[in-house]
Amino acid sequence: MKIPFSPPDIGPQEIEEVIAALHSGWITTGPRTKEFEKQIAAYCHTERAVCLNSATACMELTLRLLGIGPGDEVITSAYTYTATASVICHVGAQPVLIDTALGSLEMDYEKMANAITERTKAIIPVDLAGIVCDYDKIYGIV
């Protein structure tokens, strides 16, 4: 199966913004980051938002905020980047890997449903290569 990926869409405006950020001396937690956090919070109709350096950091923070840790299980797709499973290990929980459905890049939802136990505290679905999981099906199962 050939999965097409698109090249980055970076134009002159994005390049100028990067140059301006580099010239500002602030490339992480400076005023541009704080302004972005305010704008994204407003866009999401919430009081606060926080910028993180990666989806990996975001997933680990989310698991910690949910109180997930030793003794807990978190279900995720076996077909994913290692970070998805490693953040589960970082918080002390046990990853439960679900194979993809035959002919698909999505988790096998029947196997996912059968893997849920009293120790299951979360499911981390994986959208891959532009293919979005069937979240209605996942919500219907949980």
What are these model-derived regions, one by one?
Residues 26-73, 87-91, 97-99:
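Phosphate-binding glycine-rich loop
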